[in-house]
Amino acid sequence: VELTGSNGWKIGGMVKGSGMIAPQLATMLCVITTDAVVSAGQMQAALAVAAEHSFNRIDVDGCMSTNDTVLLLASGASGVEPDKDEFNKLVREACVSLSRQIIGDGEGASHDIRITVTGATSEDAALACGRAVAASNLLKCAISGNDPNWGRIVSSLGTVPPEVAPYDSNKVTVDVNGVRICENGGAGRDRSEVDMTCLLYT
């Protein structure tokens, strides 16, 4: 991936590894470089936030490894000191792009699923719910068979301890690619209306 800042500075990166990819520890090596003039402290802060919202949230096979490295290097060759917010934004965009490419390269991968949780009591609660859905082998089987089975999504939420993510099952709504197949804990539109040939948004 290569991105360009408003003053002409650039940031780019490459990543290797798409097996043993699970949140926070994975068999992967990622190197991101920039020609911007930035301090080590600024790079560390930007990368920590970016990694938390990209590499630390992807899951290919549910298996972890300790061989996990993401590097951000700056040469300063452009002579440009970028706006801090823009730098943070582009670091995050680079990490998100690279992490999604890992997903696409997963061994035997046939579907790319993006899970968004709204209405949770906290970000930690939302993350716990999202990871429970992503880890569901029953859901993976359903998706592999091009069946957006909302019951398996809802049941996976039940594996999250209520003290971690309290919720009312009668208020759960599930949309898949813009089609509301579950509303207030019950059946919504027919799941046959969901287009399963494209990137899945749940």
Residue ranges and their predicted role:
Residues 42-98:
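Acidic, glycine-rich loop-and-beta core segments that form the ion-binding/anion-interacting portion
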Residues 12-15, 29-34, 70-75, 112-119:
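Short glycine-rich or small-residue beta-strand-to-loop segments that form or flank ligand, phosphate
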Residues 76-145:
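A glycine- and small/hydrophobic-rich beta-loop-beta segment
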Residues 1-53:
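Glycine-rich, mobile lid/loop segments that gate access to catalytic sites or pores
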Residues 22-27, 43, 126-128, 154-155, ...:
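Short acidic, glycine/serine/threonine-rich loops at helix termini
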Residues 139, 143-197:
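C-terminal hydrophobic structural anchor segments
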Residues 201-202:
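Conserved small/polar residues in nucleotide/adenosyl-binding loops
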